[in-house]
């Protein structure tokens, strides 16, 4: 069965539903929020009672508030009962956060839309394309099947996911530019969107980034050179998560590094680890360590001290060795 036939199966589930919950992933990014807002708007256009949800009570990074419709997304630990659940941009059930048990119990009325290679397909219908640059690009094609008219709000959400998940169009298939063109035709101010999602920062955030970046180190991990940055709990507690999450893009660009890693200690002794590389399959490395993601961009959770977490990553890179270079790096 192709994803196009799955589009039709998913459309049938949408047609039969009245109330629909659209769920994005824990610690959402622009692809998650853009996917939720665009899907909610599309469903309402089809006459559905649709709402967007994130399975956490912590707020999202403030720059994501620039995506139209984001103000309506509900951050909560309880997912209301609905006729249909559409899970977007979640590579696993765990990524739905507090909603995990509810999602497990509602498989027969769940549609999964995602582009992560590690997604096992946990819905009744799974619209998964690992070639897709972002979840929003899959939604663009599905909305065509549903007969949804692309509004400026829908276009904004879809473009936000495409822009950020391609690193501002630095990787992806040629078709991504055609998708961007389609979305731009709906009157998007792409300069403003980029400014809000990529460029805008505060003096406090820049000062925080400076303190953390001064600690960057280079380590040997078998045949590879690893740029490492640790954002410890004492330094980042109470500060902007958006600033901390953006650190990996600077670390990945260090000259001479094969891949970059940022260890973010949001809770004492628990590190959210982001991995990036332009030529290695850090997705395989993350899966080996219990996480997931894409070939060039992935992550996992580590526990223990800073030294223990780093030693575990280095040992995994040494164990996997040259296999990390075997995956095709055409897109993210």
Question: Where do the protein language model's features map onto the residues?
Answer:
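Hydrophobic helix-and-loop "lid/oligomerization" segment in the mid-to-C-terminal part
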Residues: 2-26, 34-62, 81-82, 159, ...
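Short gly/ser/thr-rich secondary-structure transition/capping motifs
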Residues: 3-5, 66-73, 93-94
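Short glycine-/acidic-enriched loop or helix-start segments at secondary-structure transitions
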Residues: 32-33, 95-99, 122, 272
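Short acidic low-complexity segments
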Residues: 71-81
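Local beta-strand N-terminus motif with an aromatic residue
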Residues: 82-83, 123
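Short, conserved loop/helix-junction motifs that constitute active-site signature segments
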Residues: 101-108
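Short alpha-helices
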Residues: 113-181
């Amino acid at each position: 069965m192709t994803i196009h036939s799955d589009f039709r199966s998913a459309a049938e589930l949408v047609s039969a539903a009245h109330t629909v919950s659209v769920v994005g992933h824990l610690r959402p990014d622009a692809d998650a929020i853009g996917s939720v807002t665009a899907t909610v708007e599309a469903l309402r256009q089809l006459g559905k009672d649709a709402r967007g949800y994130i399975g956490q009570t912590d707020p999202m990074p403030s720059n994501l508030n620039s995506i139209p419709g984001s103000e309506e997304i509900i951050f909560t630990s309880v997912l209301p009962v609905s006729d249909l659940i559409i899970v977007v941009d979640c590579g696993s059930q765990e990524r739905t956060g507090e909603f995990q048990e509810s999602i497990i119990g509602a498989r027969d009325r769940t549609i999964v839309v995602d582009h992560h290679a590690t997604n096992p397909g946990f819905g009744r219908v799974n619209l998964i394309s690992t070639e897709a640059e972002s979840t929003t690009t899959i939604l663009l094609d599905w909305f065509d099947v549903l007969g949804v008219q692309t509004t400026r709000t829908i276009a904004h959400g879809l473009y936000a996911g495409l822009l950020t998940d391609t690193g501002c169009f630095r990787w992806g298939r040629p078709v991504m530019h055609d998708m961007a063109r389609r979305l731009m035709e709906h009157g998007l101010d792409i300069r403003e969107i980029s400014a809000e999602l990529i460029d805008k920062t505060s003096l406090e955030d820049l000062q925080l980034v400076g303190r953390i970046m001064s600690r960057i180190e280079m380590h040997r991990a078998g045949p590879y050179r690893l740029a490492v940055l640790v954002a410890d709990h004492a330094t980042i507690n109470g500060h902007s998560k958006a600033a901390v999450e953006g650190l990996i893009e600077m670390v990945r660009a260090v000259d001479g590094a094969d891949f970059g890693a940022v260890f973010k200690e949001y809770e004492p002794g628990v590190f959210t680890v982001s991995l990036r590389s332009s030529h290695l399959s850090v997705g395989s490395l993350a899966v080996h360590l219990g996480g997931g993601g894409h070939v060039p961009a992935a992550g996992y959770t580590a526990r223990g001290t800073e030294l223990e977490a780093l030693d575990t990553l280095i040992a995994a890179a040494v164990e996997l060795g040259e296999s990390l270079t075997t995956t095709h790096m055409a897109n993210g």
